[in-house]
Amino acid sequence: MIIAPSLLAADFGRFAKETVRVEKAGAKWLHLDIMDGHFVPNISFGPQVAKTLRPLTRMFFDVHLMCSKPEILLEPFAKAGANQVNIHVELGDQVTPLIWKARSLGMKVGLAINPPTAIGLLHPYIGQVDSLLIMTVNPGFGGQEFIHETLPKIQQAYAWRAENKLSYRIGVDGGINFATAAECARAGADTYISGTGLFGQRSLKAAIKKMAAIALKNHPAGGFDPDHPIEAAIANVSAQNASKP
């Protein structure tokens, strides 16, 4: 199971210290929400933040591009040290070129889907990606209420993975707390993006540990294969950063 704290919920004036704190709390992933004010109504930050934070941590940088023109950000984020980029299936004909462009830059690729979008739009791409990211709120702002009607999307993604003998991760993002993490785990999720659900707790370390235990307990397969390509990538990122002076 992967518990990925979302930097969007951290103190914007202390990103460097917050990143170090997240890693010390036991997180292997850091989720970076990139919003352009067009695809979603909010604006967050850009690749310079990732570049600044990269030398401070061994964590896997999972970048979520909520942008109308993600193609202009792929190379800057690759150079900044992103390990995976999530693009939106709602971009239609742009999706396949974006997948291949991201791969050519050495990044893993996730495909995100918004709550109102039909899950079937993901199916043509399931053999091309490393992760499916099921948005469980309408993207753009942190701290929203979990949309329970998104649970069947998680179940479908889980069924497709088994039916097609694939190995993509199934992530959930939005309104993820201890209770909703359990619901998502029962539906088949194995990667949990959580902002206020983690940062709002007294102890971030205890919160990450508790959410991971809840997810593991409720998941139908008891977790996920540690030999999954992204699990291997996380280990590789940690090893590479550990070897740096």
Describe the role of every protein-language-model region.
Residues 99-114, 124-128, 149-170, 174, ...:
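Post-transcriptional modification and biogenesis factors for structured RNAs
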Residues 1-86, 91-94, 101, 109, ...:
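Conserved N-terminal beta1-alpha1 strand-loop-helix module at the mouth
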Residues 137-139:
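Short glycine-rich anion-binding loops that position phosphate/pyrophosphate groups of nucleotides
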Residues 166-172, 177-181, 185-245:
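Alpha/beta catalytic cores of nucleotide-metabolism and tRNA/nucleoside-modifying enzymes
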